[in-house]
Amino acid sequence: MYYPDEVGTAYYMTRLSEHFAKFYEVGVLCGRPKYNARGVPVPRREFLNGVWIERCIDSTLDKNIFVFRLFNVFVSSLSIFLKALVRINRGDLVFVVTSPPLLPFVTTVACKVRGAKLLLRIDDVYPEVFVATGILKKGSFLELFLIYLNKLLYRAVDRIFVLGRDMARLAGNKAGRCSDRIRIIPNWADADIVFPMPKLKNPLLKELGISDKFVVQCAGTMGRAQAIETLFAAAEKLLDNKDITFLFIGSGQKVNWMKKKIREKSLKNIIFLGQRPRYDQNNFLNACDVSLVTLLPGMTGAGVPSRMYNVMAASKPIISVASEESELSLVTKEEDIGWVTSPANPDDLVKTILEARSDLGRLEEMGRRARLLAETKYSIKSIIAKYERAIEEIILEENHLKNI
């Protein structure tokens, strides 16, 4: 995943690669989207912002159909693997992500064959994501087999980067005696791109005619890992509260279900806009009073929603609709930037929304704290410095071994 893809992993990998290209020779092997965001065909090879990019053969079948998604994963991973066997050299540091899920395994083989060091960034922990989203049955042979494979993977790589404490625990259990290779490095907030905007000046709220409403927003992926059903159940219970509007912005497997429910239940307090381009983030993330960020209970440790950091940058309080043990909920509670509610209890969410609406002064204080975190603890400078230290560790270790 890499530019011009706009998904979170592609964005973060692009920014990291371009940063390290200032100090090292950086090359990227990735899938090949047909067009960029402006409809311009994407070249197979290019040198962009200091990075050599080679886009491999890819399949673009509908990823919402599971069989097609598997085919896409296989084609993309095989293509990158074959290129990696040629492009990777002895002594290289290779950085790989967990999407698609097969990619880390084929990259590990390529690195072992070519004598390179491998750094694994975990965005999603498998097979836990598959179990939580209902793709695999817990306790099934396939789940146990995938757990075994991932244990081998985690013990074969030289560093593991995880996005939160819950993920570190889960990955640590699989890494076993190699758990000392794990480093917690969260995603960053784009505080220079996303910044607070007065509600009455927000163009999206003006366009929708809801500047005078208390707006509860959920932006991002509307997929199997999100407790969208709980959010809709809460919205239905608040249907008679005419001053509260729910604004959904995003895409994913549950979009058709959402549209159907809005029609069937006449949920006039819900506005669904679909996906918006990343460059419009500042407008749409500021189009609310409070932001909902959600994960299913089984997703604790299996993923951390990157959207939360730019919600902070927009100075918006968060209602975490997720397990209390998730990184999302831990940050929300520890930093006092919002509320934590159960992803299985719409009544709890209703109560929290009404509490938030009744104390706008507290909302403002939470928003200020969230923005400060985005500018400091979760700034791009702070997070990239963590990657720099981790890479320096690897280089020092390698030099030490050479001198023995």
Give residue spans per PLM region.
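N-terminal subdomain of nucleotide-sugar transferases
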Residues: 1-49, 399, 403-404
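Carbohydrate-associated surface elements
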Residues: 32, 166, 188
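Conserved donor-binding/catalytic core segment of Leloir-type glycosyltransferases
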Residues: 210-226, 232-235, 247
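A short, well-ordered alpha-helix in the C-terminal region of glycosyltransferases
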Residues: 213, 348, 355, 362-376, ...
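Nucleotide-activated donor-binding/catalytic signature segment of Leloir-type glycosyltransferases, i.e.
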Residues: 239, 243, 249-250, 255-282
